[in-house]
C-alpha cells in the first residue's frame, strides 16, 4: 500500500490553494526550467523509494517496530526534498524576473539596465524569504498532519488485523464445536434409529441368559438327584456291610435248612400282604366310583328339589299376594270399621290390652241409618287401622307378615269336613267378592276429621288389648234362646212395613231399592273388658248399655237421624247378644288332625310346625263344628257370624248376598 496517494489527497483536501499553487509552480517550472532535471528526479526518486518501502509492506503482515524507522526515514527525505524545492523555485523566479526585465527593456528604452537591476534585487530577496518562510511553516504543518493521519490509519489497520485474526480463531473454534455437535447429533439419531435393534439384542441376550439359567438349574437338580441316589446307595451298602460283619462275627449260626424255612415263610407273608394291599386298592377304587355315582345322583336330586322349592316358593308368594288382596278387600268391607269408637279420656292412664280376635256379624241386623253412616266411612279407616295393628302385634319382618296372611284361612278350613268343601267355599267367596267389587262403593269425603280421631282411638284400643291377658269368650248356644228369637221375629214382621216406608225415603248415599231381610238374632255374652271396648269405653271401666252408647261419636245429620230412628224403632237398633258356649276340657284331636292335614296340603310341613307351636296356647270350642255345618247347609243370604272367633289372629268370612248392592259381610281385627 503506497503512501504517496493518501498524502497527496490529504494535502489537496486540507490546503487546496497550496496544492493549486504547487501545481501551477510545478508546471511553470517544467515549462520554464528544463535545465533542472536532476533535482526533480532525485526528489521523485526519494518519494518513490519511500513509496516502494511503504508498498513493500503487505496488508496481512504483522505489526513491526521497523515501521517507525521507515516513517522517520521517509520524513527526513521529504524534508530534504522540500528544502531543495524552494531553491529551485527561487531560480525559476529569477528566470521569470529576467524575462520580465527583458520585456521592460524592450518597452522602456530610456531607463538604463543597471539602475533597474540594483533597485529590484533587495526587494525580491525579501519577498522570496517571506514566501519561503510561509511555505516552510505550511509544509511543516501539512507534513505533521499527514504523519498523524498515517499513524492513525496504521493503528486502525493494526486493530483490524487483530480483529480479523480473532474472528479467524473464533471461526476455527466454532467450526470445531459445530463438528462435535454434528457428531453428537448423528450419534443420537443413530441411537434412536437403532433403539429397536438394541432392544431386540437385549431381549435375545435375556432369553439366552434365561435358557442358560434353566439349563444350569436342570443340571444342578440332576446332580442333586444323583448325589441323593449315591447317598442312598452308600447307606444301603453300609447297612449290608454291617449285617455281613455281624454274621461273620457270629460263631453259633443255625443250619441252612432252618434259615431257608424262615426265608420261605417270610416271602409267603410278604406275598400275602401284597395281595391284600392290591385287593384293598381295588375296593377303594370301586368304593370311590360308587360314592361318586351316589354323589352325582344326590346332586341331581338336590338340584331337582331346589327347583321344586323355587317353584313352590313362587307359588306361595303368588298365593300370599292373592291372600293379601282378599284380606284387603275384606278389610275394606268390614262392618266394624266405625263401631269401635269410645270416649277415651287419657291414653296413658289406662292399661293396654293385646288380643287378635276377629268379630263378625250380619249387617242386616243393624238399623238402616247406621248402615248408611257406615257405608260412608268404610274404606280409609280399616286400611290404616289394620296396618297399624299388624305393626303393633309384631315386627319380625316379611316372614311374620306372610304367616299372618296365611293365618287368615285356618278357621274357614277347619270348619269344613274336607278339602273339597273348603275349595268350594273359597270359590263362593271369590265370586261374591267379584260381585261386590263390580258394585260402586259410596264414600263421604266430608268426615275426614272424624276418621282420623277414630283411627287414633282404635290404635290405643289395640295397645290396651295387647297388655291385658287374653280371656275366654263364652258363646251362648242359639237353641237356648229360642223363645226370644221367636218374639223378635214376630216384632220384625210387625215393623216390616215401617222399614219399607223408610226405604222409600230419598237418600243420596244409599241404594234406591233396599230390602232388609228377616233373620233370627243370636245372643252372645262377653267379658267386661270386651263389652266396654265394644261400647267405646275403656277396658277397666264399668259396663255400658248396648243400645245407648253404640254410636257416641257420630256427628252431623247421621247422628241426629240415627237417634230419632232408635227412639222410634227400638227393635231395628243393633243390640248384639251372643249365645253362650260350653267349655270343653278335652281337646279335639280330630279337629287338629284335619287342620294340620289341610295346612300341609296347602302350605307345606314348615307352616304346620309353626302353626302347632302357636295353636298350643289357644283353646278350641266344640260349637265351631256345629256352626260350620249350619253355615254349610244355610243359603248364602242367611249366613251368620257364627264363626267369628277362631284360634287364629285373622279369619276369612263369607260375604252375604243381600238385596242391596252395598250390604255385605265385614271383618275387623281387634
Swiss-Prot record:
Q: Which domain of life is it from?
A: Eukaryota
**Which family is this sequence assigned to?**
Belongs to the LCA5 family.
Tell me one Pfam family matched here.
Answer: Lebercilin
**PANTHER family according to UniProt:** C21ORF13-RELATED, LEBERCILIN-LIKE PROTEIN
- GO cellular-component terms in the record? axoneme
What's the name of the protein? Answer: Lebercilin-like protein
Q: Which organism is it from?
A: Bos taurus
* TM region positions: none
Coiled-coil regions, chain positions: 145-335, 418-468
Q: Which InterPro entries match?
A: Lebercilin-like (IPR026188), Lebercilin_dom (IPR028933)
Protein's GO biological process: intraciliary transport
Alphabetical keyword list: Coiled coil
Q: Where is the composition biased (Low complexity)?
A: 52-61
Region named Disordered: 1-63, 373-399, 413-453
> Which residue stretches does the UniProt record annotate as biased composition, category Basic and acidic residues?
418-436
Q: Does the keyword Coiled coil apply?
A: yes
Amino acid at each position: 500500500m503506497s503512501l504517496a496517494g493518501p498524502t497527496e489527497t490529504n494535502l489537496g483536501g486540507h490546503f487546496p490553494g497550496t496544492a493549486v499553487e504547487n501545481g501551477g509552480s510545478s508546471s511553470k517550472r517544467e515549462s520554464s526550467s528544463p535545465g533542472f532535471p536532476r533535482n526533480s528526479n532525485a526528489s521523485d526518486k526519494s518519494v518513490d523509494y519511500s513509496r516502494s518501502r511503504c508498498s513493500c509492506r503487505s496488508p496481512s503482515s504483522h505489526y513491526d517496530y521497523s515501521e517507525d524507522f521507515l516513517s522517520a526515514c521517509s520524513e527526513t527525505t521529504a524534508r530534504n526534498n522540500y528544502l531543495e524545492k524552494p531553491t529551485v523555485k527561487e531560480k525559476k523566479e529569477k528566470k521569470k524576473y529576467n524575462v520580465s526585465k527583458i520585456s521592460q527593456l524592450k518597452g522602456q528604452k530610456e531607463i538604463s539596465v543597471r539602475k533597474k537591476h540594483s533597485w529590484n534585487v533587495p526587494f525580491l530577496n525579501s519577498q522570496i524569504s517571506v514566501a519561503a518562510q510561509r511555505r516552510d511553516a505550511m509544509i511543516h504543518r501539512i507534513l505533521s498532519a499527514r504523519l498523524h493521519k498515517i499513524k492513525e490509519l496504521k493503528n486502525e489497520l493494526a486493530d483490524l488485523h487483530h480483529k480479523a485474526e480473532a474472528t479467524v480463531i473464533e471461526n476455527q473454534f466454532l467450526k470445531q464445536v459445530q463438528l462435535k455437535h454434528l457428531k453428537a447429533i448423528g450419534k443420537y439419531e443413530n441411537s434412536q434409529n437403532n433403539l429397536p435393534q438394541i432392544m431386540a439384542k437385549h431381549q435375545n441376550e435375556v432369553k439366552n441368559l434365561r435358557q442358560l439359567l434353566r439349563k444350569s438349574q436342570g443340571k444342578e437338580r440332576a446332580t442333586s438327584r444323583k448325589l441323593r441316589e449315591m447317598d442312598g446307595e452308600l447307606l444301603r451298602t453300609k447297612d449290608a456291610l454291617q449285617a455281613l460283619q455281624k454274621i461273620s462275627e457270629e460263631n453259633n449260626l443255625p443250619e441252612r435248612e432252618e434259615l431257608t424255612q424262615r426265608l420261605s415263610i417270610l416271602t409267603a407273608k410278604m406275598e400275602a400282604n401284597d395281595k391284600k394291599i392290591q385287593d384293598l386298592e381295588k375296593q377303594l377304587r370301586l368304593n370311590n366310583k360308587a360314592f361318586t355315582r351316589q354323589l352325582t345322583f344326590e346332586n341331581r336330586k338336590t338340584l331337582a328339589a331346589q327347583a321344586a322349592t323355587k317353584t313352590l316358593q313362587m307359588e306361595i308368594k303368588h298365593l300370599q299376594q292373592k291372600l293379601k288382596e282378599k284380606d284387603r278387600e275384606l278389610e275394606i268391607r268390614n262392618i266394624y270399621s266405625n263401631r269401635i269408637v269410645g270416649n277415651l279420656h287419657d291414653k296413658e292412664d289406662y292399661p293396654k290390652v293385646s288380643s287378635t280376635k276377629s268379630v263378625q256379624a250380619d249387617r242386616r241386623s243393624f238399623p238402616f241409618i247406621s248402615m248408611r253412616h257406615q257405608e260412608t266411612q268404610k274404606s280409609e279407616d280399616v286400611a290404616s287401622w289394620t296396618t297399624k295393628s299388624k305393626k303393633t302385634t309384631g315386627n319380625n319382618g316379611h316372614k311374620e307378615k306372610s304367616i299372618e296372611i296365611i293365618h287368615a284361612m285356618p278357621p274357614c278350613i277347619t270348619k269344613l269336613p274336607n278339602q273339597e268343601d273348603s275349595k268350594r267355599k273359597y270359590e263362593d267367596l271369590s265370586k261374591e267378592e267379584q260381585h261386590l267389587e263390580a258394585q260402586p262403593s259410596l264414600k263421604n269425603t266430608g268426615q275426614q276429621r272424624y276418621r282420623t280421631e277414630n283411627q287414633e282411638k282404635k290404635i290405643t284400643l289395640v295397645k290396651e288389648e295387647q297388655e291385658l291377658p287374653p280371656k275366654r269368650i263364652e258363646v251362648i248356644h242359639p237353641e237356648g234362646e229360642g223363645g226370644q228369637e221367636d218374639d223378635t221375629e214376630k216384632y220384625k214382621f210387625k215393623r216390616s212395613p215401617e222399614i219399607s216406608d223408610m226405604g222409600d225415603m230419598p237418600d243420596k248415599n244409599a241404594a234406591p231399592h233396599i230390602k232388609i231381610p228377616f233373620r233370627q238374632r243370636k245372643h252372645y255374652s262377653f267379658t267386661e273388658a270386651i263389652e266396654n271396648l265394644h261400647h267405646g269405653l275403656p277396658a277397666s271401666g264399668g259396663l255400658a248399655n248396648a243400645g245407648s252408647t253404640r254410636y257416641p261419636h257420630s256427628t252431623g245429620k247421621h247422628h241426629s237421624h240415627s237417634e230419632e230412628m232408635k227412639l222410634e224403632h227400638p227393635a231395628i237398633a243393633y243390640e248384639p247378644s251372643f249365645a253362650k258356649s260350653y267349655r270343653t276340657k278335652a281337646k279335639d284331636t280330630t279337629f287338629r288332625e284335619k287342620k294340620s292335614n289341610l295346612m300341609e296340603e296347602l302350605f307345606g310341613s314348615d307352616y304346620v310346625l309353626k302353626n302347632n307351636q302357636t295353636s298350643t296356647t289357644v283353646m278350641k270350642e266344640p260349637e265351631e263344628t256345629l256352626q260350620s255345618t249350619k253355615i254349610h247347609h244355610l243359603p248364602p243370604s242367611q249366613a251368620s257370624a257364627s264363626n267369628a272367633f277362631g284360634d287364629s289372629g285373622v279369619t276369612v268370612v263369607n260375604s252375604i248376598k243381600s238385596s242391596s248392592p252395598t250390604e255385605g259381610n265385614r271383618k275387623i281385627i281387634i
